[in-house]
Structure formats: structure tokens, C-alpha cells
């Protein structure tokens, strides 16, 4: 799940996330999102994102093109996610490291990752996520930009699950 970010950043996230092996991207509209996707332009935006997904899948020699879903409000995205392991990168998390969390759940067949917008995940969004079994994880001591956090977390997940360099 990726919060709405600036146009070029979202396109870059889609491209790089697919190169790293994700199976789908669910854009999410969150309280602190700076950019709001105009509903009238959603179909055109999805078409563009899917073309980027197709090109990235081809470049990385993937047989299956990941799906870019239509943006959802955060509450619906958090409550409808059915992944075995639901992770939320939270900038003030001090206890749960991404690595330790992944090592505690080696049997997870599917992993969802929520990355917040530039303004971070709101308290209400955090509480709702926690109530629906999303685990808060730290990506380290620094505050990362949305696109950096997404790719750092994806690379770490791929590495820990044996899908990158191992």
C-alpha cells in the first residue's frame, strides 16, 4: 500500500517496486497526503501506471505484470487487506525493527507494506491499522522520504525472505 505521492515519485516507486518483485500496488489516500488524486483523472492515471508496470516487468524479465489497483481511502485499505503479514513503516517506532519482525514470521506467504505520505501516518490511522493486525516497524534511526522508505523496506523484505541476494 502506497500513499498518494507526487506524480513522478509514484511512477518511480511503481517502476522500482516491480523491479524488486512486488505483486501488486494499492495506492492509499491518507490524512497527511499532500497530493490528492482527482477522481476524474483516476482512470487515466491507472492506465499510465499500468503501462509503467508493464515496462518494468518486461525490463526485469517478469512473466506476470503486477497489478496497480485504484486508490482507496486509508480506512478501507487497512480493513480489507488479507495479507498474512501486514507491516506499517512508522517513523517513531522504536521497538519493532523490520528485520526482527520478518524473522519472527518466516512462514508468511504474503506481506503487505504500508508506507505513509510525506506528513507521516496520523495517530488515527496508526490506531486503525493496529486494530486490524498491522505491525508497526522501524526502518532505522532516520526519517526517510516516502519513495526512499518504500524501496528500502522492499529491498529489506526481499533480502530477509531470500528473494534478493540470498
Describe these PLM feature segments.
Residues 9, 73, 120, 148-149:
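Residue-level recognition of oxygen-bearing side chains
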Residues 3, 118, 142, 146:
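Glycine- and other small-residue-rich loops at beta-strand/loop junctions that grip anionic moieties
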Residues 1-87:
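RNA substrate-binding interface of SAM-dependent RNA methyltransferases
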Residues 84-120, 125-126, 134-137:
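Active-site/ligand-binding-proximal alpha/beta "capping" segment
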Residues 42-46, 104, 155-156:
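Short, hinge-like loop/turn segments at secondary-structure boundaries
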Residues 72-78, 94-96, 144:
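A short acidic, often aromatic-flanked loop/helix-cap motif at beta-alpha or helix-coil junctions
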Amino acid at each position: 500500500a502506497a500513499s498518494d505521492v507526487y506524480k513522478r515519485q509514484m511512477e518511480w516507486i511503481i517502476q522500482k517496486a516491480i523491479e524488486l518483485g512486488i505483486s501488486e500496488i494499492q495506492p492509499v489516500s491518507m490524512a497527511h497526503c499532500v497530493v490528492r488524486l482527482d477522481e476524474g483523472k483516476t482512470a487515466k492515471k491507472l492506465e499510465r501506471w499500468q503501462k509503467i508496470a508493464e515496462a518494468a516487468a518486461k525490463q526485469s524479465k517478469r512473466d506476470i505484470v503486477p497489478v496497480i489497483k485504484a486508490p482507496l481511502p486509508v480506512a478501507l485499505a487497512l480493513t480489507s487487506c488479507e495479507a498474512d503479514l501486514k507491516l506499517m513503516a512508522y517513523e517513531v517506532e522504536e521497538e519493532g525493527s523490520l528485520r526482527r519482525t520478518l524473522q519472527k514470521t518466516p512462514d508468511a506467504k504474503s506481506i503487505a507494506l504500508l508506507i505513509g505520505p510525506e506528513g507521516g501516518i496520523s495517530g488515527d490511522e496508526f490506531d486503525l491499522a493496529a486494530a486490524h493486525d498491522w505491525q508497526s516497524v522501524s526502518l532505522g534511526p532516520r526519517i526517510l522520504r516516502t519513495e526512499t522508505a518504500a524501496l528500502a523496506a522492499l529491498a529489506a523484505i526481499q533480502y530477509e525472505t531470500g528473494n534478493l541476494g540470498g
